[in-house]
């Protein structure tokens, strides 16, 4: 473990250590993105779905009953962090739009396009059930469900996303409600 004392002795800042860790993680543990079917079948072409043409991910997802995407690294060990490699969420968003993030384990993260319209409560229950039944305590991340908003580039808990959407919707309705209403003219103004 690297302590602040070691950083000071080595003359390395926390920011530099963080940046080096990000760069090295991507080199040593390259990103792997595949459909759930490909993952179950042993990771067929694990990087091709993401690295090649934009159509490849969409085409692969068309054949899926539930279009779940698995994000991990090539070793499939401690790969959940690969979702946080620079620009990964943004690139996924370009291909599939907004998406919900289901923390599967420390080894992978599941991504579900919002276009599927799965009820949030159902997803939360599913994550909690799978974690409780199939994921070892040491590999468990959380029972929370997260969301990535491609337009605003916001990663947040799904409950916060829903609240933010509701707030934005209410603001939009309030703004729409005042459109077209003319301000009363001053008493000294005349109209013909």
Where are these regions (language model features)?
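Alpha-helical oligomerization segments
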Residues: 106-176
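A contiguous, surface-oriented mixed alpha/beta subdomain in the mid-to-C-terminal portion of proteins
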Residues: 1-136
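Non-Sec secretion/translocation targeting segments of pathogen effectors
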Residues: 170-192
């Amino acid at each position: 473990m690297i302590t602040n004392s070691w950083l000071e002795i080595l003359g390395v800042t926390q920011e530099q250590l963080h940046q080096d860790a990000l760069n090295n993680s991507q080199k040593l543990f390259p990103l792997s993105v595949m459909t759930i079917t490909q993952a179950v079948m042993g990771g067929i072409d694990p990087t091709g779905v993401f690295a090649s043409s934009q159509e490849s991910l969409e085409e692969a997802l068309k054949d899926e009953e539930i279009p779940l995407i698995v994000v991990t690294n090539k070793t499939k060990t401690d790969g959940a962090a690969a979702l946080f490699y620079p620009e990964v969420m943004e690139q996924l968003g370009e291909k599939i739009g907004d998406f919900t993030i289901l923390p599967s384990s420390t080894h992978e993260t599941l991504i579900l396009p919002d276009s599927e319209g799965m009820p949030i409560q159902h997803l939360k229950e599913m994550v909690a059930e799978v974690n409780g039944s199939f994921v070892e305590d040491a590999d468990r991340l959380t029972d929370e469900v997260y969301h990535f908003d491609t337009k605003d580039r916001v990663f947040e808990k799904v409950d916060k996303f829903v609240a933010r959407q509701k707030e934005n919707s209410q603001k939009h309705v309030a703004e729409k409600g005042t459109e077209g209403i003319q301000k009363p003219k001053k008493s000294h103004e005349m109209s013909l």
